[in-house]
From Swiss-Prot:
Name the UniProt record assigns to this protein: Anti-Pycsar protein Apyc1
Binding locations of Zn(2+) 2: 61, 63, 146
Domain of life: Bacteria
Keyword Transcription: no
Species classification: Bacteria, Bacillati, Bacillota, Bacilli, Bacillales
Length: 250
């Protein structure tokens, strides 16, 4: 089974040129948006993708560059189109997403809008379980280290592709993924500047064996990315708006 992924944004939280790091996954006619940051609605508009063409949104954690566009989705879907789409949320984040990120803008007691489920078909996902999002598309949540004390997740898609979302460098995990057969491709966030903070840095990723680097495509980078082309070892930088096809064949 193949997957297509179009990066509607490839930038870090503060990138202005490359937009927030959000991905549109296409599989068997289903379009899943991985994260919906502040720039997501504009990015989709520029690509000519209507929000009514999005079948579901999957959230990896609750920073604004990953959830800041959900309010616009909620209002437009409800009041302009009168429709509901699936919102896939890690079970540990369902309440925090509403209480700490969306409630201030979306709650409207006068209209009986008091919870996330009043806007979306909310599907809570447990970690370390393979979930079928759509026939032919599975997702497994992998707990990641990003911000201490805050739940954050990477994703395994179809046991084919590892999508880090936001994660600190984990040498052992990346080597294990590459040698265990759990995936064939790795899309990893990459902080270009030092020192390391809450993302893997390019220098850290360059310590990986070349065989692992060859599996990695870099995303969630700073606006200065072009200065680092040719300096990323065997790894390549993903391009904003480009559609990539990932197949089981090597």
């Amino acid at each position: 089974m193949s997957l297509q992924i179009q990066m509607i944004g490839t930038g870090s939280a503060f990138a202005k040129k490359f937009y927030n790091n959000n991905a549109l996954v296409k599989c068997n006619g289903f379009q899943l948006l991985i994260d919906c940051g502040v720039t997501a609605p504009r990015a989709l508009h520029e690509l000519g993708v209507p929000i009514t063409g999005i079948d579901g949104i999957l959230i990896t954690h609750i920073h604004a560059d990953h959830v800041g566009g959900i309010e616009e989705f909620a209002f437009r879907l409800k009041y302009k189109y009168g429709m509901t789409i699936k919102l896939f949320v890690p079970a540990a984040l369902v309440n925090p997403l509403w209480d700490h990120s969306l409630r201030g803008g979306l709650e409207n007691k006068a209209e009986g809008l008091e919870q996330l489920a009043d806007y979306f078909d909310v599907v809570a996902l447990e970690e370390a379980v393979v979930h079928e999002i759509h026939p032919g598309l599975t997702v497994e949540l992998v707990r990641s280290q990003h911000i201490a004390g805050k739940a954050s997740y990477s994703l395994l898609l179809n046991n084919l592709l590892f999508y880090s979302s936001d994660a600190r460098f984990n040498y052992a995990q990346l080597v294990e993924l590459s040698t265990s057969g759990r995936c064939k491709y790795i899309l990893h966030d990459c902080q270009l500047a030092e020192p390391a903070a809450v993302h893997a840095t390019l220098n850290e990723l360059l310590t990986l064996p070349e065989a692992v680097q060859e599996m990695i495509m870099l995303m969630h980078y700073d606006d200065e990315m072009e200065q680092f082309i040719g300096k990323s070892g065997k790894m390549s930088f993903m391009q904003q708006h480009k559609t990539y096809s990932f197949t089981e064949a090597t």
